[in-house]
Amino acid sequence: MITRLSTLFLRTLREDPADAEVPSHKLLVRAGYIRRVAPGIYSWLPLGLRAVRNIEAVVREEMDAIGGQELLFPALLPREPYETTQRWTEYGDSLFRLKDRKGADYLLGPTHEEMFAATVKDLYNSYKDFPVTLYQIQTKYRDEERPRAGVLRGREFVMKDSYSFDISDAGLDESYAKHRAAYQRIFDRLGLEYAICQATSGAMGGSASEEFLAVSENGEDTFVRSTSGNYAANVEAVVTQPGVERDIEGLPEAVTYETPVSETIDALVDWANSIDVQIEGREVTAADTLKCIVVKVREPGAEEAELTGILLPGDREVDMKRLEASLEPAEVELAVESDFADNPFLVKGYVGPVGLAKNGVKVLADPRVVTGTSWITGADEKERHVVGLVAGRDFTPDGFIEAAEIKEGDPAPAGEGTLTLARGIEIGHIFQLGRKYTEAFDVQILDENGKRAIPTMGSYGLGVTRLLAVLAEQRHDDAGLNWSVEVAPYQVHVVAANKDAAAIEAAERFAAELSAAGLDVLFDDRPKVSPGVKFKDAELLGMPFALILGRGYAEGKVELRVRGGEKSELDADQAVAQIVEMVAQARN
């Protein structure tokens, strides 16, 4: 097909939008792909919608190739199914809730596990119906507290979500592996740089969980990779190597000291070394001190939050994402001044595990805080610290928690060297849900022995509209976007750069021949626009190939520009065949 720029609904911008922070947001707005309606809500203009449809086509091809069957559920959903799985409350404020005129509760779907499970229950009842994989490409809604970065983190977005239903765990393993491979093919076809990372399951529940993260310095997610081996994980899923337990017998008793100059960990360490305090016969370091972070944890459905103490080695900061992931589906926030005022036993800057335990506050510790480890920590009195407080003797945590930051150079699991940190954007997430949702909806079938059985589920999400923004993040330069042939709204951008009648007529002919060869063509036929503006727009819009008809056409030559690559001069009579071949090669 041919689309003429003279009639295309498009207005390009030379300046970045004021609210744009990341390249994808700036360029998609400037190039006329999207337009802001409200915070986190965007319109898809013709070029943007064509690119999204191209991504959807790749996703459909690969989902169909593994036996997926497409359907479509409504975005407006009743409350009841989400009450069944408790996610009406677990989702908290991120759920868009509304009432109809009769007062009945509804929501705008953030995800559709409940609907898939309930529908399979209604229609299938025999092992002969399984396995089955169903998917949809649907608009989702989440009330993000801080929507940002354009369509990278919005309140309305398009996702592909698919769900596998199997009789056995072995069947689930197979379905999971098929989806994993399909996602790799999708992202490879789109030309993405990505990592497959171990992840937490969060509110989804289930067991095995992996994220596909597009590598980007503007990513909100931090992930780690091992320097040797294949280990990769979202930072929220990294498991800390536990400390070594020691024999308590014979360890010195804890001693409380006045510490008037100890408001920071560094100051506390300097004080300890100034009076020759030693830990295991050596000088004190920050790792020998114990921070006690006070947080408030509110379980789903609970009216009030409960105080909880989080114990971390002093050389580590709390990582709120890791803390939140460890406590999901509960909500967690740091204690504030009013919490200290309401609880006088909380002496800010001097809180310790002993005082918390005496006052009935739950204490969760970093895995390095094991029996026999000795610490310098708060004595629950102003300007006083205790030295030699021993875990398992002087205090015992109620449990362990992954809440400490991960650092570059930390040991990788299974002896695979050390960890390196990188940033990424989540583009896909796959889960082995198991029977969480099928049990919740009492999905029962008869197995081959005539006995009752409950199917097991897999859940597989992929952000379609986010993918377009991620590709813009990874594939751009100072001049504009740089799409692959799989994603580009048009494979070829024909530019009539010469106002000579013969050149304009030839540009029409080239556009027609390229279209007849099966390519989508964007034809810049604007008569009153200068060649310089046309070239700038061509780079900004980002089609993979631009065919320029300029002064050289009189000598039988045309110019081919590969976006982000080289410029070359072609014989006019061979140009169409060469471009068709180059597009085919780019697809492969």
From Swiss-Prot:
It is an enzyme of class 6 (ligase). GO terms for cellular component: cytosol. One of its GO terms (biological process) is prolyl-tRNA aminoacylation. GO terms for molecular function: aminoacyl-tRNA deacylase activity; ATP binding; proline-tRNA ligase activity. It comes from the Bacteria. Its EC number is 6.1.1.15. Keywords: Aminoacyl-tRNA synthetase, ATP-binding, Cytoplasm, Ligase, Nucleotide-binding, Protein biosynthesis. Coiled coil: none annotated. Belongs to the class-II aminoacyl-tRNA synthetase family. ProS type 1 subfamily. PANTHER family: MITOCHONDRIAL RIBOSOME PROTEIN L39/PROLYL-TRNA LIGASE FAMILY MEMBER, PROLINE--TRNA LIGASE. Catalyzes the attachment of proline to tRNA(Pro) in a two-step reaction: proline is first activated by ATP to form Pro-AMP and then transferred to the acceptor end of tRNA(Pro). As ProRS can inadvertently accommodate and process non-cognate amino acids such as alanine and cysteine, to avoid such errors it has two additional distinct editing activities against alanine. One activity is designated as 'pretransfer' editing and involves the tRNA(Pro)-independent hydrolysis of activated Ala-AMP. Consists of three domains: the N-terminal catalytic domain, the editing domain and the C-terminal anticodon-binding domain. Homodimer. This is Proline--tRNA ligase. The lineage of its organism: Bacteria, Bacillati, Actinomycetota, Actinomycetes, Mycobacteriales.
